[in-house]
């Protein structure tokens, strides 16, 4: 294989190859490759591929490993997006509390016989959701919500495999640089943390409340933590993937570009915060409190914004305040994206960067339309799930534009 890929060393003895075969390595400042001996067939870091010959080491810069790792992380971010969307549908169909225990391996086999299904249904009947909300549920209806939660859990395990197995392979092959190894370890650790956090969230909905008539639901705080960590995992994977796959633009570091870059970062943070506030809306069913727009009922600012004491509790526990906050954050986000778009038009930017700005603007107004429609139609499941998927698409657009504007290290 080495003979096919590279000419024999005798053929390299010509005048034009003398610098390559010189006994002393070129200074590091004058070449982009690093010379060091490797085992035959082993790749070095993601920025080089080296082959060892009998008379020395020949290192050639290569982007092949970068592309492989970048595509892998792009697939990883896609699986995380699928988990977020499936989790949202599970929440909207009120299926999240149907599986009342958690086992990493044992629960991967679903019930198959009538006796197993009856036993599973009897376990569910011991918890508040059945006693208060679903006391007239049939076994057929229970199977539907059980399979919804089962699908979400199995998808989560798939996400873990998609991260961990290729990461181990790339590590063994030596395709990860030192910095990339740290990132990959952090991503894999966050995946494992996500699984534990998901069960911690579900447990909050299985506990008996102090008031026996309280509607069984998971803690909105734990739901927001579960969604937030998933979004962090998605953003980190997607950002790293884009950085590896998309060649950076060498833009002139002007004052206008610096302002645009900072504004893009702030806008992306605002989009993230708006998506996170949606977890509180879902956790408290706040989308059903006021189903009118732009006013909330008959007024712009409803009277029941500050019904809880202390006042700070209203931000996270009062459904009216939670919906109000989500509206304000959504309007602020689309306004910031609009301003960002017009700022980008004042600077000569590459075509791909302009496309990212236009895409982000289109996604923003589509998401606003979906949100208003979901509100006015009393949160139908298909539309609400599309709205949640739109938040991921909008966050993706913001990350893409940020990546296009990133500073190129000198």
UniProtKB/Swiss-Prot annotation:
Domain comment in the entry: The N-half (TM1-TM4) and C-half (TM5-TM8) domains are connected by an intracellular loop. Each domain is formed from four-helix bundles and they align in a pseudo twofold symmetry manner. The N-half domain is the substrate heme O binding domain and the C-half domain is the cofactor heme B binding domain.
Family under the similarity heading: Belongs to the COX15/CtaA family. Type 2 subfamily.
Pathways involved: Porphyrin-containing compound metabolism; heme A biosynthesis; heme A from heme O: step 1/1
Record-level Gene Ontology MF annotations: heme binding; metal ion binding; oxidoreductase activity, acting on NAD(P)H, heme protein as acceptor; oxidoreductase activity, acting on the CH-CH group of donors
Membrane disposition: Multi-pass membrane protein
Gene assigned in the entry: COX15
Signal peptide: none
Organism of origin: Homo sapiens
Transmembrane segments: 68-88, 154-171, 184-204, 227-247, 269-289, 324-344, 357-377, 382-402
This enzyme's EC code(s): 1.17.99.9
UniProt lineage: Eukaryota, Metazoa, Chordata, Craniata, Vertebrata
Protein name as catalogued: Heme A synthase COX15
PANTHER family associated with the record: CYTOCHROME C OXIDASE ASSEMBLY PROTEIN COX15, CYTOCHROME C OXIDASE ASSEMBLY PROTEIN COX15 HOMOLOG
């Amino acid at each position: 294989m080495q003979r096919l890929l590279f000419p024999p060393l005798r053929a390299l003895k010509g005048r034009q190859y003398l610098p390559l075969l010189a006994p002393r390595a070129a200074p590091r400042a004058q070449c982009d490759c690093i010379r060091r001996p490797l085992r035959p067939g082993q790749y070095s870091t993601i920025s080089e591929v080296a082959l060892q010959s009998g008379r020395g080491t020949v290192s050639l810069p290569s982007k092949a490993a970068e592309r492989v790792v970048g595509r892998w992380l792009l697939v990883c971010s896609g699986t995380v997006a699928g988990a977020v969307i499936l989790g949202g549908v599970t929440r909207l169909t009120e299926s999240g509390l149907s599986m009342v225990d958690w086992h990493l391996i044992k629960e991967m086999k679903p019930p198959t016989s009538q006796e197993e299904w009856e036993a599973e249904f009897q376990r569910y009947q011991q918890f508040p959701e059945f006693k208060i909300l679903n006391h007239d549920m049939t076994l057929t209806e229970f199977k539907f919500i059980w399979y919804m939660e089962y699908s979400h859990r199995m998808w989560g395990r798939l996400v873990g495999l998609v991260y961990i197995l290729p990461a181990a392979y790339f590590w063994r092959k030596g395709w990860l640089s030192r910095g990339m190894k740290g990132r990959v370890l952090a991503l894999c650790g966050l995946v494992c943390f996500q699984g534990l956090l998901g069960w911690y969230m579900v447990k909050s909905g299985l506990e008996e409340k102090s008031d026996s008539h309280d509607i069984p639901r998971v803690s909105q705080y734990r739901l927001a933590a579960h969604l937030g960590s998933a979004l962090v995992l998605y953003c980190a994977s997607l950002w790293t993937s884009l950085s590896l796959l998309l060649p950076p633009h060498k833009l002139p570091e002007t004052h206008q570009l610096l302002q645009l870059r900072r504004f893009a970062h702030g806008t992306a943070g605002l989009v993230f915060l708006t998506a996170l506030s949606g977890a509180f809306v879902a956790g408290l069913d706040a989308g059903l409190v006021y189903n009118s727009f732009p006013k909330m009922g008959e007024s712009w600012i409803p009277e029941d914004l500050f019904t809880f004491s202390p006042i700070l509790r209203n931000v996270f526990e009062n459904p009216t305040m939670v919906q109000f906050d989500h509206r304000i954050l959504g309007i602020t986000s689309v306004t910031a994206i609009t301003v960002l778009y017009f700022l980008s038009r004042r600077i000569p930017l590459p075509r791909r960067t302009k496309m990212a700005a236009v895409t982000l603007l289109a996604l923003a107004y589509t998401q606003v339309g979906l949100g208003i429609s979901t509100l006015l139609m009393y949160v139908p499941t298909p539309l609400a799930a599309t709205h949640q998927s739109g938040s991921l698409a909008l966050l993706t657009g913001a990350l893409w534009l940020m990546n296009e504007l990133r500073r190129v290290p000198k």
